[in-house]
Structure formats: structure tokens, C-alpha cells
Amino acid sequence: MTPNEFFSIKYHILAKAELKAYIDKLADYLSQQSYLYHTLDKPIISDSDYDKLFRLLQDLVNDNPQFKPINSVLDRVGGEVLAEFETIKHKKKMTSLANVFSLEELRDFYDKIEYDIELECEPKMDGLAISIFYKNGKFDYAVTRGDGIQGEKVSENVKTIRNVPLKLNTSNPPEELEVRGEIILDKQSFLSLNEYMQTHENKTFANPRNAAAGSIRMLDSKVVAKRPLKLYSYGIGYFSKDFVHPETQFELMQLLQSFGFTISDNMFLAKNFSEVEEYHHKMSHQRADLAYDIDGLVFKVNNIKLQDIIGYTARGPKWAVAYKFPAEEVESEVLNVEFQVGRTGAITPVARLKPVAVGGVIVSNATLHNINEIKRKDIRVGDRVIVRRAGDVIPEVVKSLPQYRKSDAQMVEMPTNCPVCDSAIENVNDQAIYRCTGGWHCQAQTTERLKHFVSRKAMDIDKLGAKLIEQLVAANLIKYPADIYKLNFDQLTGLERMGAKSSQNVLDSIKKSKTPSLARFIFAIGIKDIGEVSSDVLANHFGSLESFRDAKFEELIEINDIGEIMANNIVSFWHDSLNIKIVEELLAIGIKIQNPVKVEHAYNESFTGKTVVITGSFENYGRTELTQLLKSIGAKVTSSVSKKTDMVICGDNAGSKLTKAQELGVEVILEDNLKDLL
């Protein structure tokens, strides 16, 4: 049918069965047009006709909700807001590829296979990995990679992506099929999204990858539906026995394209290593001109049977490898050096640069780490410098180019007083770190401490973001954590960009945070060097805030994961009258700390009461899953190896923890033996 034929039908006089058939036919037609437009880039109807037909379908379903078609284009507009994402297990482990960083290492991979082979070559998209499960050809659910064993179910968000098939384009779909791919934002869409975000929300994303990942993890799919995300498929995971698997990887990708998935235009079949080198050379030079960001190339053995023979490690397939591009480096000029103050008072020099594009992002600031690094690299204001950015790493100044140095270039000196509060700056034990001594009296430290206090792993006041904290501090509405709980509706609505609904959401979020676990509360109050894991250890050991507050140094250093420096910091924290006042104000204003419940663990001869460290990756367990399993049988799982450690459970690619365990004579358990002990 054509658009005009759909419009010509007098649907308002149709019988119920006829109306349902008309709605189904219209939904199928729109799905086909969406596929032609978003996947094949070959539309056959105008945007105007598509929009009119889409509105017609919406109106018909609104008037006749009992006839709403399953997995139609209507599902792309988003649904109800979720409270949280469900965690579900992958039917087939979602592994990672081994990395190589040079052509020599890529040649080693090729030679180890010991066959004359073809390699299927493709760009390595820099986005969010996703797995989409289809049942009898219809979209069932979508899940993120997570830890490879399990991930977050993000079905409603993924359904909004225009080029994700809601039905497979085949008359004979397999009973079950899991399709895997990368969700991305192309460069132009990213720039447009950031312009919108800057105008409407006064914030932007750092890069397209963060934008894609952040969008998919939003709880409101209606917002996600407005984001120009795109899926590129790169393979399959689990499939039922009735799936007719092609003989080669290249043919598999063509099959997925016929099902309705978008695949890369830059896929290539290399018949020998010489062609692999040619592809590498071509893509390295075309990288900057691609519509989307890539951070490397992927090479897969083309023959599927040969893939099965070559096999897998616990981490991933031995028949595929990812070539990672070297960190991108460009030249820029240091316009100025400013000093930022962090949550603990640490002073960090930051170079203000002449804006330059690097790694897909416009960079105008770069870290200089500390004053010792500045002196070692001899970086001066006015210098031309090399700036590097790799992945999500904060851009850094690698080195200066003294051959271009101007005569008026200025050396950088560490200030003696805080640039924010004018308190003295101290250097303890002649280390590289200098700190402002102002504490809560320094507005910069106050702001960062309050950001930490409300953060997701602390008090989890999710509607109270970093920008709003900055506004509240600048307006003198909050100075200490308890002030957050004194905020009222009028104060919030009086701030820029804060309407009635947003203000009420903030107040609801604050109220919801009043019953934190003891571990969250310890983490939130910001004791120096006490992170999330240490807070959990301390909460479980002491059981209450009162016991923790009264802890002596001698008791603290006996606790696994708590060393002398951390113990000293804890004792010093509770000897500071201002810290005690801050905590008491929080308790007085209604914070009800939930103490950990003592759980009776199942007894296990090998693990109950033992201190265990996990290192490496495992074939049959995710790290989170294994940690929870060990805790359930009474083991204490810690993050570092020490003399107090009873055993180290070791998977593939174990690093320094295994070395330290061997040096200390700590028992090492391999995954092969773990199942018997459990």
C-alpha cells in the first residue's frame, strides 16, 4: 500500500476485526519504512507522509488501546519512568577481546593461528556494548554488558532507537537469537545534542561514548527517545538449535543486515596478512573523516568452524583481537596555568589551552598533575605543548616543545596561599601533593565535599547534581551537609533553571536519603582515604556509628584493609570538633542510620571466617557474583593482599596481587579448584 491508500480508507466505519487488521497493517508498513530509512538509508516515502501516518497510528491506538500492536514503531517514543533497572544474566557470557597495540603484535596473533586464514575486519566502535534478545523474531529484551555474566535490562530505552529492529525482517525467524552490537552517537548528532544540553540543562557530555552510555542508563525512556542514538551490530551471542548459522563471519554479518540490522560500511574481508596491513593503513588515515568515533579495529577469523577449533579463554575468544589506536596527540599552546582545589584540599595545576580537537573532543583544559611534574617537564605559560587524550582519560600535557619557546614564557610556581580562600598551603613530608588548610572554610573544598556527600555511592541524593550544589553554595544556602536537609521549596524555586517540578523532585530525593546504611554514611562524611570498600569493612566490623566513633588506633589497624595511614585519618577525623559537630547536626535533623544486620552464614570449612582477595577474570563467575557467594559462606572479601590475607582466588590475567601473594606465602587457589572447595 501507499500512504494515500492508507489515508483513503474510512477507518472510522470499520468493524472491530477490520479496524484491528488495518492498525496491524499500518504498524507493519511504518516498521518497514523505518527500516528503509534508518538502516538502509533508502527511504521511499517523504518524511511528511511518514509523520502523518505515524500520527494516524498514534490516534487510532489512543482511541482503541486494546488493538495496540506488539513491538511496533509506537514503542520507540518511550514508556513509563522506571525506578531502577533489573539485573539479568546473559544466556551466553558477553566477553571482551584481547588487545594488541602494534602491527607486530597483530602479526603475532595472525601467525599463532597456524592456518592460512581469512580475517573479517571492521572498525571498533567507541560506544556502549549491548545484547538484544529476540524470541520468534520479535524483540524480547535488551541488556548491557555489565560484568560479562550479567547486565542491566534496558529494553524500553533500546526500543526507542530508530534502527533497532523490533521484528526481524525474515519469514522464518529462529526461536531464539541474541544479537550483539554497539550503541553510538555519530559526531554530528553528538554536537547537536551538546548544543541542546548546554542551552536547556547547562551541562554537556564529554564525548559521544559518554553520551550514548548515559542515555541508555536513563530511567525515563521518553527522554532517551529524543536522543539520536544508533545501533551497529557486530555479531551474535546465544541462538537456538533452529538457527541456520552461516559458514563465515562475513556471511553472518550480511545475514544480520538482511534481518534489519545496521552494520559498518567499512567491513572488509582480508585474504592474507598483506591485506590486513592495507586495511589497517586505510582506516588509520580515514579515522578522522568517519561519521562516528572509533578507538581501534577488530579482526576475526572468518571461518566459523575454525573459530570453534581455536576456542576461548576465560576472558574471550582466541580467534579475534582488537587493535587499539595509540593515544591521540596534538599540539596546542598553554595560555595560563590555574590551580584547582579538590575535596581533600589537594591543589592540582590545570593548563588552560588554546582549544584544539583531540580524541573526538574539543579540549581547552588539561591536567598538569602536580608541581613536580611541571618542573620535570619544564612546562611554562606561553609554551607550545603536546596534549594527549586516550579514551575517557582526562587530557594531559605530555611535554613542552622548547624549540618554539618565546622569550616571555613564564615559569609556573606553586602559590603559598589557596587561590579560593587564601588559607595557607602546606606540603606534608615533602611529597608532590600540596593541600589547602582551609577545610570547610574553603568554598572550593566545601563544594566538592558536598558533591561527594550527595553522590550515588554515598547518600545517593540523585536529583541534587553537581551544578545545583555549586548554585546552592554560591547563594550561601548550604555550607555543611545538614543544611541540605533544611532546604525549602521557595529557596529552590528562586534559583536559576529551577521550576516547581524540579524543586519538588529535589526535596523528595533529599527526604528519601534520610535512612542510609552505616557504610554509606561513613563513606559520605568523607574521611580522608576511606573509600567505598573500606567504609563497608568498617561498618560490618563496628556495627554502629557509636562504636566506630570510639574506635582506637590499635583496634583499627587490626582490621583487614585498614592500614596505619587510614587508621590515623579516622582517629584524626573524630578528634576534630567541627567534624563531630557536622555529624551530630545530621543526626539531630533526622538522619536514621541503618546498622548492618548480622547474617548467619552457611558454614564452609575452606572459607568461613577467612580473609580472601579475588584477582583476575573467571570463566564461570563474574567478580560481583563470586564476591557475594564468598560472603554468603562467611568469607571476608578484601581488595588488597597483606599478611592478614588467608588466600587469593586467582583467575586469568592476574597481576600484582598474585605476585604479592606469592611473596608473602599466601595460599593461591585457581578457578579449576574453586568449585570443589565451594
Swiss-Prot record:
It holds the Pfam family BRCT. GO terms for cellular component: cytosol. Its EC number is 6.5.1.2. The keyword Zinc applies. Coiled coil: none annotated. Zn(2+) binds at C418, C421, C436, C442. Keywords: DNA damage, DNA repair, DNA replication, Ligase, Magnesium, Manganese, Metal-binding, NAD, Zinc. Its cofactor is Mg(2+); Mn(2+). It catalyses: NAD(+) + (deoxyribonucleotide)n-3'-hydroxyl + 5'-phospho-(deoxyribonucleotide)m = (deoxyribonucleotide)n+m + AMP + beta-nicotinamide D-nucleotide. The active site is at K124 (n6-amp-lysine intermediate). NAD(+) binds at D47, S48, D49, Y50, D51, S96, L97, E122, R145, E182, K300, K324. GO terms for molecular function: DNA binding; DNA ligase (NAD+) activity; metal ion binding. Residues 602-678 form the BRCT domain. One of its GO terms (biological process) is DNA replication. SMART domains: BRCT, HhH1, LIGANc. Belongs to the NAD-dependent DNA ligase family. LigA subfamily. DNA ligase that catalyzes the formation of phosphodiester linkages between 5'-phosphoryl and 3'-hydroxyl groups in double-stranded DNA using NAD as a coenzyme and as the energy source for the reaction. It is essential for DNA replication and repair of damaged DNA. NCBIfam families: dnlj, PRK07956.1. This is DNA ligase. It comes from Francisella tularensis subsp. novicida (strain U112).
